[in-house]
A protein has these predicted regions:
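Peripheral, non-AAA+ core regions of ATP-driven protein-machinery
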Residues: 3-16, 20-25, 39-234
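Structured beta-strand/loop patches that form or line metal/cofactor-binding pockets in enzymes
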Residues: 22-34
């Protein structure tokens, strides 16, 4: 409750409306042993000229565990397979969990991190009214994560506090769909069209939901200019 009150007072910066380039709401769980609850975290990414690829700020300051570090290397593998087939990767991008002071472990935010990075490099805004959870492999396939019900309810509460718009909701891996057990209040909000749950099988699906644009299919070594990946290659 105190954490959500801090969001309401703007001490923790989370928005459930608008679109921003290089910023995604990742769904997380805070576990205090006898009590766990969901609270979204803002993942931000900033890109610039260079050839260093992804720079994980948490890793650089020893605030990330081995699973989180592995997830960032997985993201790098995916990015290089998409954008460095014919020439070396030609960007650098810092990615971090904003207002994180206790360390990060796990790979459940890797889809959110990848979306923030792609958004920063392409300068295509990401919807803030959608929270994201899900692990991914180097092929971009969405993988199931733990605590999905807590995560959904955590973002639902943020949306309820800030006001429903009808287009808010969460993205989760399809493999997690059978694990979702929600409070009746959340179930009713979904039935009434106030809140949504989208399931995805691939990171491309998440990118398209968050941007409203095609992610892009490569033809003859090029992505369409009007796609997210095409803009990332510009």
């Amino acid at each position: 409750d105190r954490s959500h009150e801090r969001v309401q007072r703007r001490e923790i910066l989370i928005d459930s409306f608008g679109s921003v380039a290089g910023q995604v709401n990742a769904l997380t769980v805070l576990d205090y042993g006898d009590h766990a609850f969901g609270l979204p975290a803002r993942v931000s990414a900033r890109s610039y000229v260079g050839s260093l690829g992804v720079l994980n700020i948490e890793r650089m300051v020893d605030m990330s565990g081995p699973l989180q570090q592995k997830s960032v290397m997985t993201i790098e593998g995916f990015l290089k397979s998409r954008f460095a087939q014919e020439f070396p990767i030609s960007f650098a991008c810092n990615v971090t969990f904003e207002q994180n002071y206790g360390g990060i472990e796990g790979d459940s935010a890797s889809m959110a991190e990848l979306c923030a990075i792609i958004s920063a490099v392409s300068n295509v805004p990401m919807r803030q009214n959608i929270g994201v959870t899900g692990s991914m492999n180097q092929f971009g396939e969405a993988q199931p994560v733990g605590g999905v019900s807590h995560k959904i309810e955590g973002f639902y509460r943020i949306c309820a506090d800030q006001g429903f718009t009808g287009d808010q909701g969460v993205i989760i891996p399809l493999a997690n769909a059978e694990n979702v057990v929600l409070r009746e209040e959340v179930v009713q909000a979904i039935r009434q069209g106030k809140f949504n749950i989208w399931t995805v099988e691939h990171i491309n699906d998440a990118i398209e939901l968050l941007t409203g644009m095609p992610s892009g299919d490569r033809t003859d070594g090029q992505y369409p200019a009007d796609s997210v990946y095409g803009k990332a290659m510009e």
